[in-house]
Amino acid sequence: MPEHQFTLKNATVVTPDRVIEKGVIDIENGRIKQVREQSDSTPEDRNALDLSGKYIFPGFIDLHVHGGGGGSFNSVDPLDHEKARSYHLQHGTTSMLTTTSTTEFLFLEKVLASLSASAKAPSKGSRVLGIHTEGPFISPKRNGAHHIPLILEGSIELLDRLIFASNGSVSMVTVAPEIRGGLELIRRLISKKIVASLGHSEATFEEATKGIELGATSTTHTFNAMSPLRHREPGMVGAVLDADDIFCEAILDGVHIHPVAFRVLLARKGIDRVNLVTDSTSYAGEGDGKFSRPDGRTLVKEGNRIVIEGSDTLAGSSLNMNLALKNCLKFSGIELHDLSKLASLNAAKIIGLEGDLGSIENGKIADLVVLDANFDTQAVMMEGVWARNDLS
């Protein structure tokens, strides 16, 4: 059999609509040629790799990731970018939106230019599908860990500068719709086919709903840093729960949201409108301790929890997508085929790449994650090539 053709067999293959217990995946030229079920009548292929006892999921897609493995995407150093991409690939993330956070505007332009360039360079890390800019067009009342002096009002001119600096790589922008110029930003993003994601917002129900009506299709880390659901003022949480079509990010590290809140989100939005993200920082994969930020503040990492020193303000996570998937199973007990949607397919739909990515289906790119019985990553494949292979 030529090297560009091979077969994986006897694994539990997780597709969007079913789980194939004795699944076979034929791969050719970096794509999935056929997904089928092993049967006694199937001729034995001695070249096939037997993955008995393993699960095969589609490669995970993370649309909100700031760094990992000691590397940050809020950096102009391509070595930082490579550290983070390599770390997350090892944990099953085959595609991502590299995500920036609020920083000094001129520096942010340089960061975006650097991210765009490094995304095109050879890498041993996750594929970069674009850039998600989280800030600076957010509410100072719901800033989270974003430095208030650097938060800006909505400006078409400044937005266009960021898009230009990124060489058109900006694919998603977090916006608070209620800030001055916020709705104009959403209109501009939609006109440029960039995803507008609502977040870091003190919006009323009406203000958030207006943003959705204008075309916002995503919600940044649902429940976190947004106006909560109250019985007389439903806020942004109420607006995104009430709207049928908008997607909702969820950070499942056991810190950002309670498992019950996640189950409520799933019950209201449905499996097809929730996507798992990490919101991980450069400290993902690092030990506990104190870390200095460029803005002069200190972060404290203890286990899964990262906060600004002297406060309870969360500052991203130390999560990876493999752990998010395991937590999702623990918190919700959903079916495996639904889990694959939350970890992969829904994210691909948000950015319009579901034709090639996000699921194990005939004709799609062969991005795969092999998990053991404990759902720990054993191997990762990108475009039919092993990027990690710990299979015995």
Tell where the protein language model's regions lie, with residue ranges.
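N-terminal metal-binding scaffold of metallo-dependent hydrolase/deaminase domains
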Residues: 1-43, 381
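C-terminal cap of metal-dependent C-N hydrolases
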Residues: 11, 349, 359-392
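Metal-associated gating/positioning segment near the N- to mid-region
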Residues: 51-110
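Charged helix-capping and loop-helix junction motifs
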Residues: 77-80, 111-115, 156-157, 231-237
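Divalent-metal coordination cores built from histidine and acidic residues
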Residues: 85-169
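Conserved, mostly hydrophobic/aromatic
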Residues: 133, 189, 219, 328, ...
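Active-site core of metal-dependent hydrolases
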Residues: 160, 164-287
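His/Asp/Glu-enriched, well-ordered alpha-helical/loop segment
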Residues: 235-250, 254, 266-278, 284-370
